[in-house]
UniProtKB/Swiss-Prot annotation:
Record PANTHER family: BIFUNCTIONAL PURINE BIOSYNTHESIS PROTEIN ATIC, BIFUNCTIONAL PURINE BIOSYNTHESIS PROTEIN PURH
GO molecular function: IMP cyclohydrolase activity; phosphoribosylaminoimidazolecarboxamide formyltransferase activity
Keyword Chaperone in annotation: no
Species per Swiss-Prot/TrEMBL record: Clostridium tetani (strain Massachusetts / E88)
UniProt name for this protein: Bifunctional purine biosynthesis protein PurH
Gene: purH
Length: 499
């Protein structure tokens, strides 16, 4: 039976209606600070917590509920005679429900606050109360999520009590929230990429229909401590996004984000099948399409500019799963919405991932994101690349790092006409890419050449320039082969393995 409730919330959403429901059901309400004023101003009968503690708020509100009169009422086990005799002796009344949500520490990260200002959003009293209530969940109902108000209200109307399983679930939500909250504070204060204990503060955005395959379950979570592209994207049309859609969108968006020029990326099964730069958006799309007109079918297309009417007309000529771009003009959106299942995504934030996380059995691997920029290009051959070849080399290297190793990309006119990856040896990747991209000019490799066979094969297909990290004990063999065949080659010193 719920007789007394303590309410202290930063987020006032729905609290007035819930408090009025409790009042109607003869529940005594105790409250603090701004919540007390909000309820009182809206004609809810409420006691200020200082009336219970006989102790005023102090230290600018830092100490309000940290008092035995509050925590004794929460933590007392009702069927423990000693506990109940103790609180009776101390004139402490039991508290049966605790409704608390916390200062918005998550929301204030990255908003330009000083250290002192951010620290003021570290909640102390709230976490202490909800942890206490969660520990004693058999006797105390604890609510931290405004979405639960209606459900609990319906439960009380129907049964006049909250059952054990619901109490346990609500308690579990407390510790789930606190692990994320404390993790965010720890990350903020430590400022370490690899702390001794790793806590990830993510919140579920939505359950997904299934994972990579229909027999796998899945959900999508977003970071509570970092902003980024996929925190605020907007779906303007089409079916719900799937697990595979979101994974593919991530890679495609990162690829077009590599370029200042107008760029388009076509992607399938997490691998680019066409990437191009154009003078116009339509040209960039047509060039990307020409890279692999077969694989683009049923894929994802990303742009780094607003989609216009002319480009939209071309896009709807084939079956695509997703289109992602910073924006769409009115005519373009109308055309794309003509395909009711086509997912049209608006995303105007650049990718901001700083770390990558990979799950392995009973552990995770964490590494910094591969954001290395080419700073020095060492021409190691007698022949020097032309300015145009150098531009194509840089373009090719930006693409190849997103292709699963072993990866080879061949390019002509800033168009990735041959992309091959996921091969267990480099020559196989080279053969596939060159076969697809006959008459290309530049070849890029994600890692060094262990032998000179890639150079030999490249020369057969008319490649004029090669860019690769270098670093093989047989680099000399590849350099000599390039010199013999009249090919220029550049070493970057930066490897781009992708597993």
């Amino acid at each position: 039976m719920i007789k007394r409730a303590l309410i202290s919330v930063y987020n006032k959403e729905g609290i007035l209606e819930f408090a009025k429901f409790l009042e109607k059901n003869h529940v005594e309400i105790i409250s603090t600070g701004g919540t007390y004023k909000h309820l009182k101003d809206n004609c809810v009968r409420v006691k200020e917590v200082s009336q219970i503690t006989n102790f005023d708020e102090i230290l600018d509100g830092r100490v309000k509920t940290l008092h035995p009169a509050v925590h004794g009422g929460i933590l007392a086990i009702r069927d423990n005679k000693e506990h109940m005799d103790t609180i009776k002796d101390k004139n402490i009344e039991p508290i049966d429900m605790v409704i608390v949500n916390l200062y918005p520490f998550f929301e204030k990260i990255g908003k330009g606050l000083s250290l002192e200002e951010q620290i003021e959003f570290i909640d102390i009293g709230g976490p202490t109360m909800i942890r206490a209530a969660a520990k004693n969940f058999k006797d105390v109902v604890v609510i931290t999520d405004p979405k639960d108000y209606k459900r609990i209200e319906e439960k009380l109307e129907k049964e006049d009590e909250i059952d054990f399983n619901n109490r346990k679930t609500l308690a579990g939500k407390v510790f789930n929230l606190m692990s994320a909250y404390d993790g965010a504070i720890s990350k903020f204060l430590l400022e370490e990429e690899y702390p001794e204990y790793l806590s990830l503060s993510y919140k579920k955005g939505k359950d997904l229909r299934y994972g990579e395959n229909p027999h796998q379950t899945a959900a999508f979570y977003t970071s509570l401590t970092e902003d980024g592209a996929f925190k605020d994207f907007e779906k303007l049309n089409g079916k719900e996004l799937s697990y595979n859609n979101i994974k593919d969108m991530d890679v495609a968006w990162k690829i077009v984000g590599e370029f200042e020029e107008i760029a388009c990326c076509a992607l399938k099964h997490n691998s680019p099948c066409g990437v191009a730069i154009g003078d116009t958006l339509l040209e960039s799309y047509k060039k990307a399409y020409e890279c692999d007109p077969i694989s683009i079918f049923g894929g994802i297309v990303a742009f780094n500019r607003k989609v216009n009417k002319e480009t939209a007309k071309e896009l709807v000529k084939i079956f695509l799963e997703v289109i992602i771009a910073p924006d769409y003009d009115e005519d373009a959106l109308r055309i794309l919405k003509g395909k009711k299942n086509l997912r049209v995504i608006k995303c105007n934030t650049k990718p901001l991932d700083k770390m990558e996380i990979c799950k392995v059995d009973v552990g995770i691997l964490v590494q910094s994101t591969d954001n290395a920029l080419i700073k020095d290009m060492d021409v190691v051959t007698a022949k020097k690349p032309t300015e145009e070849e150098m531009e194509n080399m840089i373009f090719a290297m930006k693409v190849v790092k997103y292709v699963k190793s072993n990866a080879i990309v061949v390019v002509k006119d800033k168009k990735a006409v041959g992309i091959a990856g996921g091969q267990v040896n480099r020559i196989w990747a080279a053969c596939q890419a060159l076969e697809r991209g006959n008459n290309s000019v530049v070849l890029a490799s994600d890692a060094f050449f262990p032998f000179d066979d890639v150079v030999k094969k490249a020369s057969e297909y008319g490649i004029k320039a090669i860019i690769q990290p270098g670093g093989s004990i047989r680099d000399k063999d590849s350099i000599e082969e390039c010199d013999e065949k009249g090919i220029s080659m550049v070493f970057t010193g930066i490897r781009h393995f992708k597993h």
